């Protein structure tokens, strides 16, 4: 199976994880296994990589690529949100590092029938995990106008959210919206012509919003970081690559909260809440792709890497 994906910030991620030879590492977004392959190069015979992906195509292709590493690899078909359960099933209590790449893989974008891309016509789907029964089609055809406006505004940060929601509802009253091409045409009608001259494709933000809603992407980030920190050995690291401001803001804020969890009023001279620091932030500012990487992989342009270390 051909599952091509160019790993973003590859060298930077491996350095950030500060890999211990016999450590246990979790790649929560296995994808094309590019990051995992580099982690395995550093791991010794006693080391272990746990690769998690909810996309069965990615998992199958990664299994073939990583087959030579034998028992050093355990692959799990699941969502990284279930990290607690996954580690429990593997009878693992502590780990040395976690890597999350929150972007949609190049393969998923390019695989027309998955319905992630506004550049190719396909059924409205956008499910990362195709075992799920809930797809983009359900959102577009079943959500109320107010619900559509909310997700397009919050998750897509689109100034035309209200108009787009109105036009979606008007269009689906005539006939269900079934394909990405239909969806793009509705958005083009909704966004004024003058606003379409500059900036990204008019459908980019709405497609992002719907994808986030289908896969509940933002809700699971915070819980996963907390679970990773709970299982992390002191000195272990959490490295997270985000691709838009909503994700990056969540990662930054959760890291800050875990670094300074005290909820006591500022006038208290001594902490009384007894909430203990779990991590220290390694990256004061996010690590960005180099110019060299941008030339090779333009899709990496919006990537940001943040790292925290367990204390």
UniProtKB/Swiss-Prot annotation:
Gene that specifies this protein: rsmH1
GO biological process, one term: rRNA base methylation
Name of the molecule in the record: Ribosomal RNA small subunit methyltransferase H 1
EC number of this enzyme: 2.1.1.199
Keyword check for Cytoplasm: yes
NCBIfam families: 16S rRNA (cytosine(1402)-N(4))-methyltransferase RsmH
Binding site for S-adenosyl-L-methionine: 33-35, 53, 80, 101, 108
Coiled-coil annotated spans: none
Organism expressing this protein natively: Alkaliphilus metalliredigens (strain QYMF)
Role: Specifically methylates the N4 position of cytidine in position 1402 (C1402) of 16S rRNA.
Lineage, broadest ranks: Bacteria, Bacillati, Bacillota, Clostridia, Peptostreptococcales
The UniProt record lists the keyword Glycoprotein: no
Pfam families xrefs: Methyltransf_5
Localisation: Cytoplasm
UniProt family annotation: Belongs to the methyltransferase superfamily. RsmH family.
């Amino acid at each position: 199976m051909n599952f091509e994906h160019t790993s973003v910030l590859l060298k930077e991620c491996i350095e950030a994880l500060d890999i211990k030879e016999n450590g246990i590492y979790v790649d929560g977004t296995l994808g094309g296994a590019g990051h995992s392959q580099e982690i395995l190069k550093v791991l010794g015979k006693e080391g272990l990589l746990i690769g998690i992906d909810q996309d069965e195509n990615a998992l199958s292709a990664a299994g073939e690529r990583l087959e030579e590493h034998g028992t050093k690899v355990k692959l799990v078909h699941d969502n990284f949100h279930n990290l607690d359960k996954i580690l429990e099933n593997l009878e693992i209590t502590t780990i040395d590092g976690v890597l999350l790449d929150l972007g949609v893989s190049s393969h998923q974008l390019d695989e027309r029938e998955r319905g992630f891309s506004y550049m190719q016509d396909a059924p409205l789907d956008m499910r990362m995990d195709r075992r799920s029964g809930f797809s983009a089609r359900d959102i577009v055809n079943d959500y109320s106008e107010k619900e559509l406006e909310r997700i397009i505004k919050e998750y897509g940060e689109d100034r035309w959210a209200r108009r787009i929601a109105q036009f979606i509802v008007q269009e689906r009253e005539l006939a269900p919206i079934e394909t990405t091409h239909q969806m793009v045409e509705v958005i083009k009608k909704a966004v004024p012509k003058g606003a379409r001259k500059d900036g990204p494709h008019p459908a980019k933000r709405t497609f992002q919003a719907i994808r986030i809603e289908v896969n509940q992407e933002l809700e699971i980030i915070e819980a996963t970081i907390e679970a990773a920190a709970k299982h992390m050995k002191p000195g272990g690291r959490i490295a997270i690559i985000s691709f838009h401001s909503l994700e990056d803001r969540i990662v930054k804020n959760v890291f800050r909260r875990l670094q300074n969890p005290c909820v006591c009023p500022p006038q208290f001279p001594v902490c009384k809440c007894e909430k203990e620091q779990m991590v220290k932030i390694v990256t004061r500012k996010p690590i960005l792709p180099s110019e060299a990487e941008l030339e090779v992989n333009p899709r990496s342009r919006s990537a940001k890497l943040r790292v925290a270390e367990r204390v």
